[in-house]
């Protein structure tokens, strides 16, 4: 909530060190020598790194006038400097003594957010972002030289030095084990990451090297002055790294491929995080152990914190599974909030986030400082979080860009009543009972699209009557749904009959839905499929794509492959909520036959590549075809795949990659990337949309009454195309004589 606390490991007092509502204080870290606490704060109006004396409480601002978003910081093990990264895509080193800062690395691709120190504070390793593949770099502070550890052929992440500094451990995507699709002859690569070890010094033991048990004469190596000094002062040994032929020394840890991060190496043990918990791989025993908790290591690997759920406990460095039996007490982690101060801080940070993350440096020509002043005067009058969200929304709206949103943080959320729904429409009959006037068609094999009244054993039909719910007669009930309050997902008994009378009635058990939207959507799509099929004598297929996410991809796959045998195709992008899968869909629609294949006793050939649709295509769009639903018709037109019909699309394609929360859990969406034309002529689509080839708006009255003029036009156009653009698999040629 924007404050820095210290907690006793066992017993004592919890201290709120910053105790403010007008600043976002975050990312605190003790210095390894325990003298300082470094943290990031915007208490002076911009995010900077602050130092707090752990004993006196005195504070000083270490960095000055950054005007950027700081992602993270890490102390050098000698407590003399701090490494930190920020949104201008630089990795920086700041001296604690005087605040002097040097840029260690920069990137024209993205932030440098994965970095670590060697325990002697001499070396820094980090990920250098690349357009295709990232690389691991080691920076030597003594020589000021950078050394690339990887060859750019495989993606890498999470580099870290071993405790003794002789090894580098990292994650890399080098496991090639394709999974083949069940819908077409295609593949995907999942779970490519494994853990790798790179010996850095000439005297480093090579893990998993061949061994020989024959005894050897012991070698007496007299201790050097450096060794004696290290033993006497417990300093870390001074390592000199050998960079020759470095990429060929990489060794794979024999663990299964998966999602790994947060690597550490202490002696023969490699610690890694996978699926939430930390595990150990013992290089000597060649065994993997799940520690049953998430482990976070303290400075110098002297202590660690084990986390299980929301419980934390200080422990020694573990080598066996950990149980959090004596968690740190967090009961005193409390603060008093001045909401008006907090709302001003949230307003300020929201303005800065848009400044720091917005894709266009010119802020679309808007006087962004002037916009800040314009809306700032309203904040003292805000008395509810929803009002703040509205003001921030108006502020960022000055940029005239899509994907610029403001989301509520802490605000009242009334509990919703789980109303039971039956996938049907009803009318009060003169008898007092309820007549079923419409049953929404469903796919009962799918929980999301089941229609309760049509389930096996229920089989209520249109024109039937609902007489009672759970034994209570509906004769005096004004609204049938008043008896279904709180019944969603629960078993309900309906008394039904073909006539509005109790004689001959039967009781059936149903499970009402909590949401009918998927049922209505399924029904709408099926009606469109039938309409297109009936109007084209079964020759034309129909696909609706509701978004460009998982649901949209599923709808495309479900309806594209079964209709490959159709002679033409209508694709409906109307109401598409966006996402990111339009390249996958477009690639399939772009396929053209390279050749045809026949098998023994086949009467016709098959298209190669598989999944190729031969016939003409038409695309429907409207003003609700948004985001990637905008980009899809652009790709469709760019590749000349067919005619686009309907209304100009939404026109919002400046996208975003995640959000950064503000102190109360709210966020703003900052548009951070934008598409521009293939010929480099300028940015595309944003603020205008994609124009259809045939402009046609649905009349709202006709649409409400079931007439879809745009779909009717698509049918008309596709039938005309079939007269001139019809494509079919050619007949199998005569067999050769050899």
Where are these regions (language model features)?
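Structural motif
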Residues: 3-5, 46-50, 90-92, 133-137, ...
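Multi-bladed beta-propeller domains
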Residues: 7-26, 31, 41-42, 52-71, ...
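Residue-level detector of Asp-centered blade-edge/turn motifs that repeat once per structural unit
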Residues: 32-33, 77-78, 119-120, 163-164, ...
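Hydrophobic beta-strand positions that form the internal "hydrophobic ladder"
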Residues: 37, 79-82, 121-124, 168, ...
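Short beta-strand elements that form the blades of beta-propeller/WD-repeat-like
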Residues: 83, 269-273, 302-313
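Cleft-lining beta-strand/loop regions that shape enzyme active-site pockets
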Residues: 357, 446-453, 467, 472-666, ...
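Extended, small/polar residue-biased N-terminal targeting/export presequences
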Residues: 380-435, 502-528, 715-716, 720-737
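PDZ/PDZ-like domain segments forming the peptide/carboxylate-binding groove
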Residues: 417-476, 550, 673
């Amino acid at each position: 909530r924007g404050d820095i606390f210290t907690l006793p490991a066992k017993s004592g007092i919890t201290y709120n060190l910053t105790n403010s509502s007008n600043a976002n204080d975050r990312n605190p870290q003790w210095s390894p020598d325990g003298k300082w606490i470094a943290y990031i704060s915007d208490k002076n109006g911009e995010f900077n790194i602050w130092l707090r004396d752990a004993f006196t409480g005195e504070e000083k601002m270490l960095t000055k006038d950054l005007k950027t978003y700081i992602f993270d910081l890490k102390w050098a093990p000698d407590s003399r400097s701090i490494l930190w990264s920020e949104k201008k895509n630089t990795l920086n080193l700041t001296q604690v003594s005087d605040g002097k800062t040097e840029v260690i690395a920069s990137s024209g691709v993205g932030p440098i957010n994965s970095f670590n120190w060697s325990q002697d504070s001499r070396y820094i390793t980090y990920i250098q972002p690349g357009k295709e593949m990232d690389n691991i770099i080691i920076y030597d502070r003594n020589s000021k030289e950078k050394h690339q550890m990887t060859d750019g052929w495989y993606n890498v992440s999470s580099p870290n030095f071993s405790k003794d500094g002789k090894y580098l451990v990292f994650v890399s995507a080098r496991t090639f084990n394709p999974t083949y699709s069940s819908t077409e002859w295609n593949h995907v690569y999942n779970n490519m990451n494994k853990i790798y070890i790179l010996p850095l010094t000439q005297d480093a033991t090579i893990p998993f090297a061949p061994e020989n048990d024959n005894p050897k004469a012991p070698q007496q190596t007299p201790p050097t002055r450096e060794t004696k000094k290290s033993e006497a002062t417990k300093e870390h040994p001074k390592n000199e790294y050998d960079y020759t032929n470095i990429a060929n020394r990489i060794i794979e840890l024999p663990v299964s491929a998966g999602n790994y991060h947060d690597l550490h190496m202490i002696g023969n043990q490699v610690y890694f995080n996978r699926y939430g918990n930390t595990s150990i791989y013992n290089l000597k025993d060649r065994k993997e152990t799940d520690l049953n908790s998430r482990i976070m290591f303290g400075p110098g690997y002297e202590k660690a914190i084990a986390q299980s759920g929301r419980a934390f406990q200080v422990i020694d460095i573990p080598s066996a599974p950990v149980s959090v039996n004596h968690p740190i007490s967090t009961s005193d982690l409390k603060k008093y909030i001045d909401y008006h101060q907090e709302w001003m801080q949230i307003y300020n940070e929201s303005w800065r986030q848009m400044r720091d993350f917005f894709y266009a440096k010119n802020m679309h020509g808007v006087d962004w400082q002037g916009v800040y002043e314009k809306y700032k005067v309203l904040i003292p009058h805000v008395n509810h979080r929803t009002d703040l969200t509205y003001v921030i929304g108006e502020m960022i709206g000055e940029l005239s860009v899509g994907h610029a949103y403001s989301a509520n943080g802490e605000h009242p959320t009334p509990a919703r009543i789980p109303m039971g729904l039956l996938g049907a429409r009803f009318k009060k009959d003169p008898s007092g009972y309820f007549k079923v006037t419409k049953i929404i068609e469903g796919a009962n094999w799918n929980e999301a699209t089941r229609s309760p009244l049509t389930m096996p054993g229920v089989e209520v039909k249109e024109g039937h009557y609902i007489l009672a719910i759970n034994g209570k007669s509906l004769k005096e009930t004004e609204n049938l749904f008043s008896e279904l309050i709180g019944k969603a997902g629960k078993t309900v008994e309906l008394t039904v009959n073909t006539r509005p009378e109790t004689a001959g009635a039967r009781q059936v058990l149903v499970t009402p839905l909590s949401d009918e939207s998927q049922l209505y959507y399924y029904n709408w799509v099926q009606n469109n499929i039938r309409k297109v099929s009936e109007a084209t004598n079964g020759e034309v297929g129909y696909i609706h794509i509701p978004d460009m996410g998982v649901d949209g991809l599923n709808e495309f796959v479900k309806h594209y492959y079964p209709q490959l045998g159709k002679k033409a195709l209508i694709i409906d992008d109307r109401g598409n909520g966006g996402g990111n899968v339009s390249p996958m869909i477009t690639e399939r629609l772009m396929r053209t036959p390279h050749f045809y294949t026949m098998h023994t006793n086949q009467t016709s050939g098959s298209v190669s590549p598989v999944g190729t649709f031969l016939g003409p295509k038409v695309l429907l769009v409207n003003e609700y075809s948004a985001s990637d639903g905008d980009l899809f018709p652009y790709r469709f037109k760019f590749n000349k795949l067919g005619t686009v019909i309907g209304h100009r699309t939404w026109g919002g394609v400046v996208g975003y990659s995640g959000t950064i929360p503000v102190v109360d859990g709210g966020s703003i969406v900052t548009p951070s990337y934008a598409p521009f034309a293939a010929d480099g002529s300028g940015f595309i689509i944003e603020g205008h949309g994609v124009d259809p080839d045939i402009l046609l708006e649905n009349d709202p009255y006709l649409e409400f009454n079931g007439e879809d003029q745009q779909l009717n036009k698509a049918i008309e156009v596709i039938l005309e195309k079939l007269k001139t653009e019809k494509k079919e698999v050619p007949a199998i040629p005569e067999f050769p004589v050899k």
